[in-house]
Amino acid sequence: MASSARPPLTAAAWAPLLREALAREGRFRWPLRGTSMLPTLPVECEIEVAPLPVPLPERPRERLHLGSLVVFAAGDILVAHRLVRRAGGQWVMQGDGRRAPDLPVEPEQVLGVVTAAYQGGRRCWPDRVEPAVRWFWVARYYLLRPIRFTWHALRGLRGPS
């Protein structure tokens, strides 16, 4: 008996659909799962995603800023994490509730920027302190970077256990 279940959509299949929806509608809402953005975003909230800002010749500084929450494709899932670094044409993101950053991604993997979060129909993010909080998370990335580097170097010197 043949199964009638459809195979799940892959990122290659749904990312263009989401980009098209963003271009057509200007925004979309997406349910957020997981704890990687705690304490900033509550578990099982709904995020509002808008297109990335496009720098124009007359406004060259209008671009995505460090500390912005972005949505990107990682494998076959959507991830909402904070942009903490741009390096060598790639972007590095990190969840506020994570100790280490994500692997670098190509800018083409980034689908949009999070503009708001809702829980129970009420807006829960951003709040008045978000501009200061944004810089706290970016600073944390840079302050912990030498510690992570040293930790990995020392672990490499120990050899296999």
Regions found by a protein language model. Give the residues of each.
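Extended hydrophobic leader/signal-anchor segments used for secretion and membrane insertion
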Residues: 1-161
